[in-house]
Swiss-Prot record:
Organism the protein comes from: Escherichia fergusonii (strain ATCC 35469 / DSM 13698 / CCUG 18766 / IAM 14443 / JCM 21226 / LMG 7866 / NBRC 102419 / NCTC 12128 / CDC 0568-73)
Primary location recorded for the protein, binned into one broad class: membrane
UniProt function note: Part of the high-affinity ATP-driven potassium transport (or Kdp) system, which catalyzes the hydrolysis of ATP coupled with the electrogenic transport of potassium into the cytoplasm. This subunit is responsible for energy coupling to the transport system and for the release of the potassium ions to the cytoplasm.
Catalytic activity: K(+)(out) + ATP + H2O = K(+)(in) + ADP + phosphate + H(+)
Active site: 307
Subcellular location: Cell inner membrane
Alphabetical UniProt keywords: ATP-binding, Cell inner membrane, Cell membrane, Ion transport, Magnesium, Membrane, Metal-binding, Nucleotide-binding, Phosphoprotein, Potassium, Potassium transport, Translocase, Transmembrane, Transmembrane helix, Transport
Entry-linked Pfam families: E1-E2_ATPase, Hydrolase
Residues noted as binding Mg(2+) in the record, renumbered to the chain: 518, 522
InterPro entries for this protein: ATPase_P-typ_cyto_dom_N, ATPase_P-typ_P_site, ATPase_P-typ_TM_dom_sf, ATPase_P-typ_transduc_dom_A_sf, HAD-like_sf, HAD_sf, P-type_ATPase_bsu_IA, P_typ_ATPase
Bilayer topology annotation: Multi-pass membrane protein
Membrane-spanning ranges: 34-54, 62-82, 219-239, 254-274, 588-608, 616-636, 656-676
Family under the similarity heading: Belongs to the cation transport ATPase (P-type) (TC 3.A.3) family. Type IA subfamily.
Protein's name in the database: Potassium-transporting ATPase ATP-binding subunit
Length: 682
């Protein structure tokens, strides 16, 4: 992607995030995060107590209470800053997209045809169903479908890809996106959306929306954090009468400090930032997610449906071998195959011409001088070829050639059937060549499996993800390629109905399914899949059915999408583990400091040997605030992701974030206590 990648702490974003952090101090903003709302209330309460102590209305150490109050406000500000910084990065990405939107005029046609009378209207007044004409140099004013014409289109403003693409009426390349530019020729387009509903508008809203909906896992975690907060709130509330009964009541300031240090403020302050950053990281790979729910679902996926062509294989099948029929010389087959392919501009056709040239020095003949009639490939005939000097040469699929021969009163040779099976078992696609009603032999078209793909599938398998290859090839060819690529299963001779049925079958087993698609025929399956990545080069129907759009139109990106989803879930889980483990050290810091005067036996818990009760409590509160700042980079970038089994991943995270969550606070609180003591601040 050519877009500028934002630095983690871009100065302009940091300044803006600090301003937003202050704005978020209002109660309406704080209420959305129950854990931090408790801290906000505690900050307000201790501020009032500090003022009362300073004015003499209440007894107590006003300076200590003010210090606690100040650091509680800092804790809230740091949590606000983390969320604002994540949102700011997304808004910066949205602003780069807004730059694509250009106020322009459109030529609205009165009739749906080229050459019809046109009215010049503002582009933002176009409605769904309006017909517009765009010519070379024009900006396409709306999302739509090409109903007439063909043109080269520069989509770099949307995709970041500088190479132009062809958009034309009919087929899967008729969809155009508003904001892109026509480089040559012309298009007549039917607008498919109303103002404010374009793909670009939706992209901006998705990456900019501060009022994003929480995902199911995020809601579940929030409920857990609220439950823990309530438990600690009740526990802290009972400590005041407990200490008062002992003859030395603990101050409200100390109790508030204890509560704030015990509740999971670390994950509470970073939870929103993690969710926003997940969508932002997805956008960084040029994938637009319609919601955080889609990103989260990607992390839970356990079945991947992968198209063979372009995802598992390179996609350009190359002629690798000429296999003559019984009684036919290989050179005769190669000559006929080359003649039939002279006008075939597909990669397969060109590779046949080149292979014949390499094997038998059969030079490519001048098409014009042959005075031949070329027969183009059609979906109905599934054959192509040439008529030359009373010779009728055809090449095509086995079934198509068989029907062609039988229609001309011939018989398909049994030995060629065997050769076809042999080619298919090797993972190649058989193409049969016939002259008249005589079968000359088979061309093997080899689809090359991408390097390293087998290892990636092995990693996915280790993570518990099943890979299924989807292909239109016959079962023998599909089985051979599946074995070579290392996928777990395959669906051969796939149809849209078969894809949809397969997705429903896996979902009935309780699995979450991810897939990619680009055509209108993929729309039902995309709508059914839990994670559906539509290609930006695909049809409008496919993009509307999916819950993600890949701007690069790269089917392989599906594996990366799953990795990002899993990384977001791992980040959330790891920081939750770290946050809860933190409480142990804070317990050893504050409990002895708060209650040792009443119960001297609790001094045994002061294993850190902190200087004084005041320094112990203040050190814990300061650490509680600072740890949020130190973890912001981790929340935004995500934890280091490695493809491991669920049990191995759990063990790794417990060691790193569980044990780390235990040890880091002990070290941090002790260091802060020493600094406070050396500086004479307590």
């Amino acid at each position: 992607m050519s877009r500028k990648q934002l630095a983690l702490f871009e100065p302009t974003l940091v300044v803006q995030a600090l301003k937003e952090a202050v704005k978020k101090l209002n109660p309406q903003a704080q209420w959305r995060n129950p854990v931090m709302f408790i801290v906000w209330i505690g900050s307000l309460l201790t501020t009032c107590i500090s003022i009362a102590m300073a004015s003499g209305a209440m007894p107590g150490n006003a300076l200590f209470s003010a210090a606690i109050s100040g650091w509680l406000w800092v804790t809230v500000l740091f949590a606000n800053f983390a969320e604002a910084l994540a949102e700011g990065r997304s808004k910066a990405q949205a602003n780069s997209l807004k730059g694509v939107k250009k106020t322009a005029f459109a030529r609205k046609l009165r009739e749906p045809k080229y050459g019809a009378a046109a009215d010049k209207v503002p582009a933002d007044q176009l409605r769904k169903g309006d017909i517009v004409l765009v010519e070379a140099g024009d900006i396409i004013p709306c999302d739509g479908e090409v109903i007439e014409g063909g043109a080269s289109v520069d989509e770099s403003a949307i995709t970041g890809e500088s190479a132009p693409v062809i958009r034309e009426s009919g087929g899967d390349f008729a969809s155009v996106t508003g904001g892109t530019r026509i480089l040559s020729d012309w298009l007549v387009i039917e607008c498919s959306v109303n103002p404010g509903e374009t793909f670009l508008d939706r992209m901006i809203a998705m990456v900019e929306g501060a009022q994003r909906r929480k995902t199911p896992n995020e809601i579940a975690l929030t409920i857990l954090l609220i439950a823990l907060t309530i438990v600690f709130l009740l526990a802290t509330a009972t400590l005041w009468p407990f200490s008062a009964w002992g003859g030395n009541a603990v101050s409200v300031t100390v109790l508030v400090a204890l509560l704030v240090c015990l509740i999971p403020t670390t994950i509470g302050g970073l939870l929103s930032a993690i969710g926003v950053a997940g969508m932002s990281r997805m956008l960084g790979t040029n994938v637009i997610a319609t919601s955080g729910r889609a990103v989260e679902a990607a992390g839970d996926v356990d079945v991947l449906l992968l198209d063979k062509t372009g995802t598992i294989t390179l996609g350009n099948r190359q002629a690798s071998e000429f296999i003559p029929a019984q009684g036919v010389e290989e050179k005769t087959l190669a000559d006929a195959a080359q003649l039939a392919s002279l006008a075939d501009e597909t990669p397969e056709g060109r590779s046949i011409v080149i292979l014949a040239k390499q094997r038998f020095n059969l030079r490519e003949r001048d098409v014009q001088s042959l005075h031949a009639t070329f027969v183009p490939f059609t979906a109905q005939s599934r054959m192509s070829g040439i008529n030359i000097d009373n010779r009728m040469i055809r090449k095509g699929s086995v079934d198509a050639i068989r029907r062609h021969i039988e229609a001309n009163g011939g018989h398909f040779p049994a030995d060629v059937d065997q050769k076809v099976d042999q080619v298919a078992r090797q993972g190649a696609t058989p193409l049969v060549v016939v002259e008249g009603s005589r079968v000359l032999g088979v061309i093997a078209l080899k689809d090359i499996v991408k390097g390293g793909i087998k290892e990636r599938f092995a990693q996915l398998r280790q993570m518990g993800i099943k890979t299924v290859m989807i292909t239109g090839d016959n079962r023998l060819t599909a089985a051979a390629i599946a074995a070579e690529a290392g996928v777990d299963d395959f669906l051969a001779e796939a149809t849209p109905e078969a894809k949809l049925a397969l997705i429903r079958q896996y979902q009935a087993e309780g699995r979450l399914v991810a897939m990619t698609g680009d055509g209108t025929n993929d729309a039902p399956a995309l709508a059914q899949a839990d994670v559906a990545v539509a290609m930006n080069s695909g049809t409008q129907a496919a993009k509307e059915a999916g819950n993600m759009v890949d701007l690069d139109s790269n089917p392989t990106k599906l594996i990366e999408v799953v990795h990002i989803g899993k990384q977001m879930l791992m980040t959330r889980g790891s920081l939750t583990t770290f946050s809860i483990a933190n409480d142990v050290a804070k317990y050893f810091a504050i409990i002895p400091a708060a209650f040792a005067a009443t119960y001297p036996q609790l001094n045994a818990l002061n294993i850190m040997r902190l200087h004084s009760p005041d320094s112990a409590i203040l050190s814990a509160v300061i650490f509680n605030a600072l740890i949020i700042v130190f973890l912001i980079p981790l929340a935004l970038k995500g934890v280091s992701y490695k493809p491991l089994t669920a049990s191995a991943m759990l063990r790794r995270n417990l060691w790193i974030y569980g044990l780390g969550g235990l040890l880091v606070p002990f070290i941090g609180i002790k260091v802060i206590d020493l600094l406070l003591t050396v500086c004479g601040l307590v």
